[in-house]
From Swiss-Prot:
Catalysed reactions, semicolon-separated: oxaloacetate + ATP = phosphoenolpyruvate + ADP + CO2
Function: Involved in the gluconeogenesis. Catalyzes the conversion of oxaloacetate (OAA) to phosphoenolpyruvate (PEP) through direct phosphoryl transfer between the nucleoside triphosphate and OAA.
Native source organism of the sequence: Halalkalibacterium halodurans (strain ATCC BAA-125 / DSM 18197 / FERM 7344 / JCM 9153 / C-125)
Gene Ontology MF terms: ATP binding; metal ion binding; phosphoenolpyruvate carboxykinase (ATP) activity
Gene giving rise to this polypeptide: pckA
EC annotation from Swiss-Prot or TrEMBL: 4.1.1.49
Amino-acid positions noted as binding substrate in the UniProt annotation, renumbered to this chain: R56, Y192, K198, R319
CDD domains (UniProt xref): PEPCK_ATP (cd00484)
Protein name per UniProt: Phosphoenolpyruvate carboxykinase (ATP)
Chain positions recorded as Mn(2+) binding sites: K198, H217, D254
HAMAP family: PEPCK_ATP
Length: 527
């Protein structure tokens, strides 16, 4: 079976079935309610439950081992190979399954706000709410663009189809399979909508570097003077929260490209964690949850329709999906100039990293390659308490190419555009997870604001004896003692022990990077 026949087979299915194509949000919401897929909250948002899968299932994600990509992909635990015949057999079974459905839902749009690099997408869904999600998260076409739209990548999502591992070559009933030659993402067995979003991110992380564009797992915003900031970090570290700043315009909250012309959003919407969400702490996100947006796995009062964002009985990984247009000060189209400031976000479960530190270019490369954070509860199946982890480039689960490819591109751009880089710890202070407290959001916001406004450029710094980080001695809006993590611990000896423990993990993890310069090697912790 070749590309033409897989495409033709899908076209036949969509031609034979009753298919709602690029339906307005109101229609998709109505369909979702009639089909029993969800219910409305008091603000008109559609709330849904995703069943057993309330987060990504990385062990069920595969890339088809095809001739054109075989030598380029970094095969391993993240990028698991699956045979072409296995994929084609499963694809045929999924289409046969979808052919029995009374109706299907199709969305056509784009990934990539910069028209030079955008990818025309087609999303075919079994569920109406999944199609609404796709409409919110990807970039919607104009009426004219839709008439001329030719998909270059297609998502086929059939959550109700459960694979049989003994027959279908999968690990479980769930699967997310990317075929770069067939230009298809095949999803089944899981209702978690984030799989659609992240699979296209993986696709763009393969395609964009081939066009000399750095793809990045980061949020981005821009100030009134046109100064651009990037926030790198894994899920739950604060990308969405910190980039939603009423004094700056939002470019995007999670996925971006950086070309010779500047940065651009890959998406057209946001997918915000909403555990413990409140209007006081995050008014922009709170107000964006309205008609047309989707709430995943949030408990809602049956009588009042009020969401309880503190209830994590289904999962810690509760989410809100909404269009960028729901953010009043978003940049549309989501393109901007070159970054002035980069902030690496980490949620340090050990509680020993400073809340903010300035990085040298060598330290920036060291920490980008290290990608240290903690896996936070709920973002992946089986994670119920934070675990220390190293995720290269702050996005290893989504990077098909070798990490060095992305790191080299970032290093070149930091040097070319003289970008200031900071490491910000949004994790624990005063002790490790379970003992200390999560860093106050108000403190983190104050530190980020000071960094973006250049207020830390002339502040005296102290060099951390273990991590070598340059810690500002003062920062507007933050008590001085908070800036030095050792000061916040009651037991200083326990702090020293924990710091050494984390430093050893950094050093052990970095041993795998054998081809980096000695200057970068020495930019990490010393024990």
């Amino acid at each position: 079976m070749n590309t033409i026949s897989t495409t033709t087979r899908l076209e036949q299915l969509l031609g034979d079935q009753h298919v709602l194509k690029n339906a307005p949000a109101s229609t998709l919401v109505e369909k979702s309610l009639l089909r029993g897929e969800g219910r409305l909250t008091d603000t008109g948002a559609l709330t849904v439950a995703t069943g057993a899968y309330t987060g990504r299932s990385p062990k069920d994600k595969f890339i088809v081992d095809e001739t054109s990509v075989h030598e380029k992909i970094e095969w391993g635990q993240v990028n698991q190979a699956i045979e072409k015949e296995t994929f084609l057999h499963l694809y045929e079974k999924v289409l046969t399954y979808l052919a029995d459905k009374d109706e299907l839902f199709e969305f056509r749009g784009f990934a990539g706000a910069d028209k030079t690099y955008r990818l025309p997408l087609q999303v075919v869904n079994e569920f109406a709410w999944h199609n609404l999600f796709a409409q919110q998260l990807f970039i919607q076409p104009t009426t004219e663009e839709l008439t001329q739209h030719t998909p270059e990548f297609t998502i086929v999502s059939a959550p109700g189809f459960k694979a049989d591992p003994s027959v279908d070559g999968t690990r479980s009933e769930a699967f997310v399979i990317i075929s770069f030659e067939e230009r298809i993402v095949l999803i089944g067995g899981t209702e978690y909508a984030g799989e659609m979003k992240k699979s296209i991110f993986s696709v763009m992380n393969y395609l964009l570097p081939e066009q000399d564009v750095l793809s990045m797992h980061c949020s981005a915003n821009v100030g009134v003077e046109g100064d651009v900031a990037l926030f790198f970090g894994l899920s739950g570290t604060g990308k969405t929260t910190l980039s939603a700043d009423p004094n700056r315009k939002l470019i995007g909250d999670d996925e971006h490209g950086w070309s010779e012309r500047g940065v651009f959003n890959i998406e057209g919407g946001c997918y915000a964690k909403c555990v413990n969400l409140s209007y006081e702490k995050e008014p922009q996100i709170w107000n964006a949850i309205r008609f047309g947006s989707v709430l995943e796995n949030v408990i809602v009062d049956e009588k009042t329709g009020l969401p309880d964002y503190n209830d994590t009985s289904l999962t810690e990984n509760t989410r809100a999906a909404y269009s960028l247009e729901a953010i009043p000060n978003s940049v549309i189209p989501s393109v901007a100039g070159h970054p002035n400031t980069i902030i690496f976000l980490t949620a340090d479960a050990f509680g020993v990293l400073p809340p903010i530190s300035k990085l040298t270019p060598e330290q920036a490369m060291y920490h980008f390659l290290s990608g240290y954070t903690s896996k936070l509860a709920g973002t992946e199946r089986g994670v119920t308490s934070p675990e220390a982890t190293f995720s290269t480039c702050f996005g290893a689960p989504f990077l098909p190419l070798p990490a060095a490819r992305y790191a080299e591109m970032l290093g070149e751009k930091i040097a070319q555009y003289e970008v200031q880089v900071f490491l910000v710890n949004t994790g624990w202070s005063g002790g490790p997870y379970g003992v200390g407290q999560r860093m106050k959001l108000s403190y983190t916001r104050a530190m980020v604001q000071a960094a973006l406004q250049g207020e830390l450029n002339t502040v005296e710094t102290i060099t951390d004896s273990v991590f070598g980080l340059h810690i500002p001695t003062r920062c507007p809006g933050v008590p001085d003692f908070v800036l030095q993590p050792r000061n916040t611990w009651d037991d200083k000896e326990k702090y020293d022990k924990k710091a050494q423990e984390l430093a050893k993990q950094f050093i052990e993890n970095f041993k795998r990077f054998t081809n980096v310069s000695e200057a970068i090697q020495k930019a990490g912790p010393s024990i």
